[in-house]
């Protein structure tokens, strides 16, 4: 494939709380050895949209996507049903309120197929196009199966130890 660009929408309830995302992995649906993708890049972006539009730019919802992973080339080896991590992942602070837009793109590959598991949904949660310079793509009512690694922000209210001790 000459190039590919895809956006997935992850709903805020699937993540659960604010924190720092330290990794993203996909679940392979086939065995793949030496699957190479050139000029590979992953970006993450907050968005208030609950469903994707057919425009990559509109889906940013006025926010700036942040590059979190890139390699040229990247080579993946994956076992069917196994997870493969994005390379050289840079932390991204997720606000816990918005939905999360996950965008991946590459320019050319070596022809080795690496398929990933998807999940069906009733709303448009995936947008793709085979040309990077096209802003309008093709919508699907599916999304990729991700494993997002996140270090949650403090979720327990700060209280005085005196108040806690007084309760005993």
What do these predicted ranges mean?
Residues 1-51, 99, 109, 116-153:
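Beta-sheet-rich sandwich/jelly-roll-like modules and their strand-loop junctions
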Residues 38-123:
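Aromatic- and Gly/Pro-enriched, solvent-exposed loop/edge beta-strand patches characteristic
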Residues 150-168:
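Residue-level detector of functionally pivotal "anchor" positions at catalytic/ligand-binding pockets or at interdomain
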